[in-house]
Amino acid sequence: MRVVLQPAYVLHSRPYRETSALVEVFTPEYGRVGLVAKGVKRQRTHRFSLLQPFCPLLLSWTGRGDLVTLTGAEAAGPIPVLTGEGLICAFYLNELLLRLLPRRDPLEALFSVYAHSLPSLIHAQQRQQILRLFERDLLAYLGYGLILKYEAGTSRPIEAGQWYSYQLEKGPVRLLSEDLEGMKVRGHTLQALARGALADPASLGEAKRLLRWLLAFHLGDKPLKSRGLLEELRRLGNVSRKEERP
């Protein structure tokens, strides 16, 4: 199979043999794809300089199976200037995609969400909301979408002033007892998450705890490296301790 000029972003790359690299990319029509980039490390070729995370690309490849051979790479736009926490947040998005996306599953809408999220991470005041909405959309496109408008198993709308216990694989259940399993969350937060408008710190905090809890169920026990990286940068004094990790 030959693919020509497919929009793509590099999620991760690692050396392969002496002069090549194995590159994981995210594309709209083919989802996550594994590429062999032959000879790209030889004298730091132009193609090697292009195959960097967060750079919008147009890639061409040939082959079948889990690994295909890269035949062409072109820049499709500028790389967003990400530093500090913004850069780590972008790596966090990449890590989620690497860990959760299956190979060769087309996800055009999620690709669009990712492409629009990256430049928004430049702005510190938007980062936490951008991350929460990306997590929400990622779960939805993978088939694990949150129930945010109605109580689980009913047609009763979520009430802003009510507390709920969000339960795995079920959804929000009206909180009548502190003994219920699940994640405690306000109806106001569920409504804000449904609208994509997490304006107040309390809703952002609750949404972060809820989504992290839900993602942990699918990620398993292996910790995310991006979270540890932010802690290390904080230890070295490169990131303010007031800045929240992903």
UniProtKB/Swiss-Prot annotation:
GO terms for cellular component: bacterial nucleoid. One of its GO terms (biological process) is double-strand break repair. InterPro entries: ARFGAP/RecO (IPR037278), DNA_rep/recomb_RecO_N (IPR022572), NA-bd_OB-fold (IPR012340), RecO (IPR003717), RecO_C (IPR042242). Pfam families: RecO_C (PF02565), RecO_N (PF11967). Involved in DNA repair and RecF pathway recombination. Belongs to the RecO family. This is DNA repair protein RecO. The gene is recO.
